Amino acid sequence: RNTILDREEELSSGDWLMVVRNNYFWLQQSIESLVNDAPLASDAAASSTMQETEKDGNGTNGISFLANGDRALVQRVRNVREVYGFRFADVWLQFPDYDRYELQATVVLDSLNTEAPALTPAQNERLFQEVMADYADIPLKQERLKKMRQDKLLNAIQVKYAYAITCHKAQGGQWAHVYLDQGYMTDDMLTPDYVHWLY
């Protein structure tokens, strides 16, 4: 990425990312801001905005959540910061597989370069505990957890660079047809191990 694209920043406009853990939070935030930003000049105007929003799946072009494997193009990166020992950035993302749907969200940068597929269970637990400590002033555990479910950093999207996608990660959803040229193969070469690898 650094050599071919000449990008020195960890994340910049034009980068391709892949969501590596399902996320339900940010689309809900997007829907709420769309509804809250509806003009209040008249009930008819607000109703019209609501109808437009509902026509295409609550204003999200039919996306119900950000799924593991969804690709996004970074439009802008702002407010890179370190909190709780993790690095976060506010980003504007465009999802080409969903009619170029755009979303403003927070991503956790630590997942970009890890060897693991996403943040490890230990990292997730550490982040959870750090966020929980921030809400320690709320005495009732149920209320504290309710507040935490709305925390933007705890719900930051976990992403990886998406310059190369394995067939497994794409889950067949990226292409209508896939053609494999395996070259010249003799019957001896078509072993169960090879077929398993091919799959």
Stretch-by-stretch model annotation:
Residues R1-Y199:
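Core RecA-like ATPase module of SF1/SF2 helicases and allied nucleic-acid translocases
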